Amino acid sequence: MRFAAGAYAVIFDEAGRVLFSHRRDCDFWNLPGGGVESGEAPWQAVVREVREEVGLAVEVERLAGLYSWLALDEVIYSFVCRVTGGALSTSDESDDASYFALDALAANTFIEHAARARDAALGQPQTILRIPTGPTGREQMRQSDG
């Protein structure tokens, strides 16, 4: 069995809010990130994805969570990242980016991404390992279209 891999960034500002980007292809907010390409390590992918999606240069601080969507044969790496440069901007994938307090997320935030941000905010020294049971982002998009 081969797993597809994704890598997402949890980026906190000085007030403890988390950066989310708004997708162009659907009306949802998500953590910046995406697929790990062939020949790329997950920590390299998250740095590339953040730069491409929201214009920020980041440095990976730690692996906060590892999530295995068994039914999808997918593994998601969630990294806490620190901004080292760049400026928030839009892209082909993102039409907005903003920091949100975890208790004041937009109603149209992907459930799985909100959960990853909350896990990272716990600040646990060990990586959180989870098999998610809620709806995937794809399922949320289908439900919102129906």
Each predicted region: which residue ranges?
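Conserved Nudix-box catalytic region and its N-terminal flanking loop in Nudix hydrolases
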Residues: 13-52
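Short, well-ordered beta-strand micro-motif
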Residues: 11, 78-82, 98-101
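Structural motif
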Residues: 18, 74-78, 97
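Conserved N-terminal beta-strand and adjoining loop/helix that marks the start
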Residues: 1-18
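Structural detector for helix-capping/boundary residues
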Residues: 34, 48, 61, 100-103
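Short helix-loop capping/hinge motifs at secondary-structure junctions, enriched
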Residues: 17-18, 86-89
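Active-site segment of metal-dependent pyrophosphate-handling enzymes
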Residues: 55-87
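Nudix hydrolase/Nudix homology domain
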Residues: 27-29, 93-146
